[in-house]
Amino acid sequence: MDKTLSQARTRVTISEVAQAAGVSKATVSRYIGGDRQLLADATAQRIEAVIEQLGYRPNRMASALKRGRTRLIGMLLADIRNPYSVAVMHGVETACREHGYSLVVCNTDCDDARERQHLQALQAYNVDGLIVNTLGHHAGELASLAQELPMVLVDRQLAELQTDLVGLDNADAVEQALDHLHACGYRDILAVSEPLDGTSSRQERVAAFQASIARRSGLRGQVLEVSANLPGQLAAFLASAGHGPQALFSCNGVATLEVMRHLHGRGEQLFQQLGLVALDDLDWYPLVGGGITALAQPTERIAAAAVQCLLERLQGSQLPARRLDLRAQLIVRGSTPIRN
């Protein structure tokens, strides 16, 4: 085939895959439709090799036109064990159900290979749209998928994607935390974050913390990432007293749990010596001492807004991609007593 004509081709067809693999179109359809177990291993392997060689991708849009919408929404999650992810997923499922849609969830477990597998599978799924909360290490594949179906990001911005984003106003949340700690008399503040790892929400919180500390007179701020070194680093921070009353700001629920694991030995006296404000408000926060002061994320509103954005795109909205940042709510508990 002429090279120029080959390059001009925009999409390999299922007929070409069937011809190259020596099987019928129905057999290829069965393979890409998730019924691989019905095929002989040799046949499935031959089809798989041809698909990879030709770069074939199922035409999801054409399939949708033939069969109509499935009223299925896909959701790609980085870590289904993360309390934030669970809360948002529940909110998305609720909003989908209210609008007559069902939710299909794929969990990557923060694993790049698994994320790639799910993306490849989602290219063949007949979902009407996709909500994404993931590490984004395969932004190219996500961008390609976004050309085929509506997509909305939750919590994490991916520069390569021009899609709607719904999440927390991270700068405002950090400002609320530091305003509260400052007003309560804390002067030496340590922020603890999960590893940044290119995750935009974590980066925004750390950057906002550093910028806010720099603007405030009399405050000292440091940042640590959760790692195997955290116990020693926390001990070093506590031993460096001298700049004034100390406090911790944990940047999400996972970081809060890690901090508390290493500080639980202090028992009920903990918050008499050290303040703590945590971003996220988990069920166990009120149970620790006099309770942990928290910045509650409006997860139900975030989820509902993400679904609404997706539905608007499904209805044909051509508005420019937008970012919706929702405000956290400060909940004061016993972990931030006033210091003289």
Curated annotation (Swiss-Prot):
Residues 12-67 form the HTH lacI-type domain. Keywords: DNA-binding, Repressor, Transcription, Transcription regulation. InterPro entries: HTH_LacI, HTH_TetR, LacI/GalR-like_sensor, Lambda_DNA-bd_dom_sf, Peripla_BP_I. 2-ketogluconate acts as a molecular effector and causes dissociation of PtxS from its target promoter. Glucose negatively affects the molecular binding of PtxS and 2KGA, and gluconic acid inhibits the PtxS-2KGA binding reaction. One of its GO terms (molecular function) is DNA-binding transcription factor activity. PROSITE patterns: HTH_LACI_1, HTH_LACI_2. The keyword Transcription regulation applies. Pfam families: LacI, Peripla_BP_3. The keyword Zinc does not apply. Residues 14-33 bind DNA. Homodimer. PANTHER family: LACI-RELATED TRANSCRIPTIONAL REPRESSOR (PTHR30146), RIBOSE OPERON REPRESSOR (PTHR30146:SF145). Contains an N-terminal helix-turn-helix DNA-binding domain and a C-terminal domain that binds the effector. Involved in the regulation of 2-ketogluconic acid metabolism via the control of the expression of the kgu operon. Binds directly to a 14-bp palindrome sequence via its conserved HTH motif. This is HTH-type transcriptional regulator PtxS. The lineage of its organism: Bacteria, Pseudomonadati, Pseudomonadota, Gammaproteobacteria, Pseudomonadales. The gene is ptxS.
